[in-house]
Amino acid sequence: REAGAYAEYTYAIKDKFSIVAGLRGDYNHYYDRFFLTPRGHLKWNITPSTTLRASGGLGYRSTNVITDNIGVLATGRAITFLDNESGKFDFRKFDRMEKALTVGGSLTQTFGLVNPGDATLSFDYFRTQFYNSVVADQEMYADRIVFYDTDGRSYTDTYQIDFSWSPVERLDIFATFRYTDSEMTIRRADGGTARVERPLVSKYKTLLNIQYATKFRRWVFDATAQLNGPARIPTQTGDLDDSYYSPRYPMFFAQVSRKVGKFDIYAGCENIADYRQKDPILNAQDPYDYKFNSMNVWGPLMGRKFYVGLRFNLY
């Protein structure tokens, strides 16, 4: 059971500036605790073509440790829960309440390359700082996965650049690049700690999408190219020196659609280059051994896929 209240204050200067500040309070019966979660949003139209946005907020989340980490059931390892106070394996004293602060903002600029206002460039930055988080650690021991809560240094910084351009009528070009710096503190079997990159998180991703539509959007042609950067693969031996990175890999997609009355007929292809992760299941021949592991998937498992479809629009 939970009871809460929320208050919000808004200040605005029409078409120029607005700020929203909010405060929420909740009492949770299960945890027998009262939680305060402040948040705020700001928008400033510096010029008619330049907009600055900022936001921040504190949040809590009660984790469902198994369903949130369902991949742990796809391994041959034992699953244990570690109590912070005693250092023993005890689920009853396991704190499942996560706490994090997210702050960030964006700057958007509209300008003309061929025609006035035909292009938009935006820069985004967001940081999430975790003050308490639940970790499913598969790197402490080789034969088990250990769940524990930690207040060690853990954060995610995300930088993103978006560019959109419509050089001619009905032709849209969109490109984006995102860089992620994500680290977490994990425990070691000797009682110490180590700060490592968050596993299975790509360091960067970039995407290019080009779409062209004929008059009245009778035909729509769409093509997308994507490059996925490397991600750290967690060690399977308990020794952090044995961890490695996945390769960067491309993905290509294409689709064409035809509008006929209220129907849209479309056909396309996913993963055109037929790229697939090799050997995604470790020790597949012995599923009852602790070395069996199918949770470290960093790339596509399905190859090239063609599809056709029919969509009906009611309105």
Residue ranges: model-predicted function:
Residues 1-29, 33-43, 165, 170-181:
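Surface-exposed extracellular loop regions of Gram-negative outer-membrane beta-barrel proteins
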Residues 3, 23-29, 56-62, 71, ...:
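Transmembrane beta-strands of outer-membrane beta-barrel pores
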Residues 5-11, 40-44, 105-109, 161-165, ...:
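Residues on the lipid-exposed face of transmembrane beta-strands in outer-membrane beta-barrel proteins
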Residues 12, 120-130, 149-236, 311-313:
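Gram-negative outer-membrane beta-barrel transporters
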Residues 16-19, 49-52, 113-121, 169-173, ...:
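Repeated loop/turn-to-beta-strand initiation elements of outer-membrane beta-barrel proteins
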Residues 31-38, 65-71, 78-82, 132-142, ...:
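Outer-membrane beta-barrel translocator domains and adjoining extracellular loop/strand segments
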Residues 45, 53, 90-149, 155:
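Membrane-embedded beta-barrel scaffold of Gram-negative outer-membrane proteins
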Residues 227-234, 257-315:
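C-terminal beta-signal and adjacent terminal beta-strands/loops
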